[in-house]
Amino acid sequence: MEYILHVDDSVKCIFCDKKQYVLKETQHAMVMLNLFPYNPGHLMVAPKRHVANLEDLTDEELKEIMELTQKSVKVLKEIANPDGFNIGINIGRVAGAGFEGHIHIHIVPRWNGDTNFMPIIGETKVIPEGIEKTFKKLKPYFE
């Protein structure tokens, strides 16, 4: 909820301005850890070019975004052994996009009994693994 309720106006775009926790870059796309993860291993895949609309992506961008999405699922299956995934795109603030100006795909690993996903009422949750630890665990698999 923090990312929806309190947008940091000093950061124009996390994908363009704040490229920390980037696991891999290709010519047209990148995959990075979400700074406000729903679950450990929550990744985001985005085009490098600042573009808001799905229909404005080039064929090359679409191809590389899907290849990185596929790679991300394979890596997460290997190291985190999730029971499933939520994979999706939030287009527009009303749809939950925290950064609506730069389209991106969320890849969220899920486990059976996972009741800690996107809590709305309490607006808090415990993430069992810190982002630094998750980054260090995932980074070698993307090299």
Positions of predicted regions on the chain:
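Active-site microenvironments that recognize anionic phosphate/pyrophosphate groups
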Residues: 1-41, 45-46
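C-terminal helix-cap and adjacent tail motif
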Residues: 2-8, 109-143
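Short, charged/polar surface micro-motifs in flexible loops or helix N-caps
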Residues: 28, 37-38, 51, 70, ...
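Histidine-centered active-site/metal-ligand motif
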Residues: 42, 50, 102-106
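Short histidine-centered catalytic/ligand-binding loop motif
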Residues: 44-66, 121-127
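Long, well-ordered alpha-helical scaffolding segments within enzyme catalytic domains
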Residues: 58-82, 132-134, 139
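A short glycine-rich, hydrophobically flanked beta-strand micro-motif that places a catalytic Asp/Glu
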Residues: 80-93
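Histidine-centered divalent-metal-coordination microenvironment in nucleic-acid enzymes
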Residues: 86, 96-116
